[in-house]
């Protein structure tokens, strides 16, 4: 299980679990630990926590503290037709193509985990009614799609949807961890050893992520145009870490000698001076 912070993809917490462990087992403690780690960063103000539907258990809400949250909620007992009728009555209709009606808004009568002892939490909804498919074929029976999210944000429902969809790059961060750092399969047959390896991987992941951000800050010194907010880990490895150098020990000093044709020398030198 992984928690990422910020828009550049730094890893906040990680936890390796046995395959037989239920996804909710230990999740509340993991969220509480992530929130505690987040507070030690001293960012100031409240943070927004975004979680998938697998983490929508009622116990997890106790770990959010005073922070804002958006948690994907899977409709279970609700009838889509009733949800559509309710959305038409209390929701806002969004602009869309012909044959597609999109309603967004809030429901205020749901309890987390259907536990009546818990206070109601607002639920942002998106109800989509399709009478014509994307190819222009009219449907005999309208196709309904209902999406809901637990949230304590006071903004418009459309903004809640956009904020939740903004956590999509987390899947890419996970892909970088597995492919770019080659940790899709952990080497040891012991869980405790693999946990240590994963923690070391998190340190390397964040160091490379930070190095990539330092390079982007020096885009003016780079030999190629950089107009993106974040570098993939493999790009950092290819352009910076894998630069060929000669390690020289002389007069009690350790020096790195770069070749005359090293394209990234000015960037690397400026980064090194900034941390000297």
Describe the residue ranges of each PLM region.
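Electropositive, glycine- and tryptophan-enriched low-complexity nucleic-acid-binding patches
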Residues: 1-42
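Short, conserved catalytic/metal-binding motifs centered on acidic residues
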Residues: 9, 46-56, 69, 149, ...
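Active-site beta-loop-alpha junctions enriched in small/polar residues
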Residues: 17-19, 54-56, 74-76
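Contiguous mid-protein beta-loop-alpha structural module that forms a pocket-lining wall or clamp
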Residues: 55-56, 66, 83-84
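A short alpha/beta connector and helix-capping loop motif
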Residues: 58-74
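An anionic, glycine-rich sequence signature occurring as long contiguous blocks
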Residues: 70-179, 270-276
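Short amphipathic alpha-helical "interface-anchor" segments enriched in bulky aromatics
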Residues: 153, 157-196, 200, 204-213
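A short, flexible helix-boundary coil/loop motif
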Residues: 208-276
